């Protein structure tokens, strides 16, 4: 196991615990006398004006559109590294987690649609339970220490990375509405420039980030979700240069602590603060939150485990070393922790709709994710050997 992956897992796990704390603080503030301060903080107007460019948004949207673009930049860097020389490099390594991830996205979406498919508005949230919060899941897994085999951690990492890639595609295809062709054309020119820089072997990360900033503005103005700029830049930064450097890994190494310890916890703090005022039992047991919670807690493990089992039984893929199906099932339950990624998709799905839809969708996410975390931890604790003396 490379030092980079080992460090990645440590940062994600610790960041997951901070993320949980941030969410709890947000929930407390949103339902206490501090509620006014909490809302005022999120509504603080922030403006950037450069020549004719004027971007004015409340702080909440700067977090969701700006800081989350940095998160997706790191996702792009991770996916590229893993595809080229990591846990997803080559068919044999990639096929098992890829099939598992596919099942883990299809089943939750189908279960959600069983509850909400008949409603024209709420059916827009079909992708909410399809996401996995890797930081949260690894944070829960970290509670079991070195009892967890390295191969099981890498399986969760690979599955979650493919899941992230699927979420990126879903956002691009299904949650983009009005499009400005002029801004999109400028974005295409920026992408072409990034591709040319990669082809010419430009190794200066700052050059990619500068063009990436222009790309972010163009995509933001185009109507496509601006976080996609981060993924594109991540894929364009070279993994290796002729002088044996790795601009991609250096940037990933530098950004990871900021993402794990600041950006994702701040996103959780900004988005998990659901006010329970006006929330009713009938609303909490309505089809929207039930569909989301069922998709996360039932659909995720059902899809991941069933697709994994079929892939092995049909000879399409092999079970990774030192892993059994009991452990796969426990991890598949942990993957039902959608949390930040599910909240992010919910904010896109119900943008401009009745605020109650966002409120109840967040409650469904919290219910499903918390249940998946508790049950997944308990099942994994039972599925693992009592003590591991071998360190990796």
Swiss-Prot record:
Keywords: Antiport, Cell inner membrane, Cell membrane, Ion transport, Membrane, Sodium, Sodium transport, Transmembrane, Transmembrane helix, Transport
Topology term for the membrane: Multi-pass membrane protein
Any GO CC annotation of this UniProt entry: plasma membrane
Gene3D superfamilies xrefs: Na+/H+ antiporter like domain (1.20.1530.10)
Transmembrane segments: 14-34, 59-79, 95-115, 125-145, 154-174, 179-199, 213-233, 254-274, 287-307, 328-348, 363-383
Catalytic activity: Na(+)(in) + 2 H(+)(out) = Na(+)(out) + 2 H(+)(in)
GO biological process: regulation of pH
Pfam family, one: Na_H_antiport_1
GO molecular function (one): sodium:proton antiporter activity
Domain of life of the native organism: Bacteria
InterPro entries: Na/H_antiporter_dom_sf, NhaA
Cellular location(s): Cell inner membrane
Main location as per UniProt: membrane
Family: Belongs to the NhaA Na(+)/H(+) (TC 2.A.33) antiporter family.
Function field: Na(+)/H(+) antiporter that extrudes sodium in exchange for external protons.
Protein name as annotated: Na(+)/H(+) antiporter NhaA
């Amino acid at each position: 196991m490379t030092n980079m992956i080992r460090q990645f897992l440590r940062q994600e796990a610790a960041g997951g615990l901070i993320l949980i704390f941030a969410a709890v603080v947000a929930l407390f503030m949103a339902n206490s006398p501090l509620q006014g301060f909490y809302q005022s903080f999120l509504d603080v107007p922030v403006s950037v004006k450069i020549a004719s460019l004027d971007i004015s948004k409340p702080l909440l949207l700067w977090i969701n559109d700006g800081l989350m673009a940095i998160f997706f930049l790191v996702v792009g860097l991770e996916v590229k590294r893993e595809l080229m020389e990591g846990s997803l490099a080559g068919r044999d390594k990639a096929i098992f987690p890829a099939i598992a991830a596919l099942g883990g996205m299809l089943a939750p979406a189908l279960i959600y649609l069983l509850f909400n498919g008949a409603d024209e508005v709420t059916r827009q949230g079909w992708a909410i339970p399809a996401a996995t919060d890797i930081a949260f899941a690894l944070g829960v897994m970290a509670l079991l220490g070195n009892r967890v085999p390295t191969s099981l951690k890498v399986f969760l990492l690979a599955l979650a990375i493919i899941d992230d890639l699927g979420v990126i595609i879903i956002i691009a295809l299904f949650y983009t509405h009005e499009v400005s062709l002029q801004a999109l054309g400028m974005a295409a020119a920026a992408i072409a420039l990034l591709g040319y820089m990669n082809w010419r072997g430009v190794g200066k990360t700052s050059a990619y980030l500068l063009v990436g900033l222009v790309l972010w503005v163009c995509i933001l103005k185009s109507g496509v979700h601006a976080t996609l700029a981060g993924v594109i830049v991540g894929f364009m930064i070279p993994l290796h240069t002729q002088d044996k450097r790795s601009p991609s890994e250096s940037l990933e190494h530098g950004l990871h602590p900021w993402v794990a310890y600041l950006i994702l916890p701040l996103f959780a703090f900004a988005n998990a603060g659901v006010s329970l005022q006006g929330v009713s039992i009938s609303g909490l047991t309505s089809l929207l939150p039930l569909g989301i919670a069922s998709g996360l807690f039932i659909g995720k493990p059902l899809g991941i485990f069933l697709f994994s089992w079929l892939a092995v039984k049909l000879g399409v893929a092999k079970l990774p070393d030192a892993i059994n199906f009991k452990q796969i099932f426990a991890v598949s339950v942990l993957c039902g922790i959608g949390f930040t990624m599910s909240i992010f998709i919910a904010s896109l799905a119900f943008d401009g709709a009745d605020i109650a839809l966002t409120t109840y969708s967040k409650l469904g996410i919290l219910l499903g994710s918390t249940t998946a975390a508790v049950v997944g931890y308990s099942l994994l604790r039972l599925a693992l050997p009592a003590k591991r003396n071998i360190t990796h």
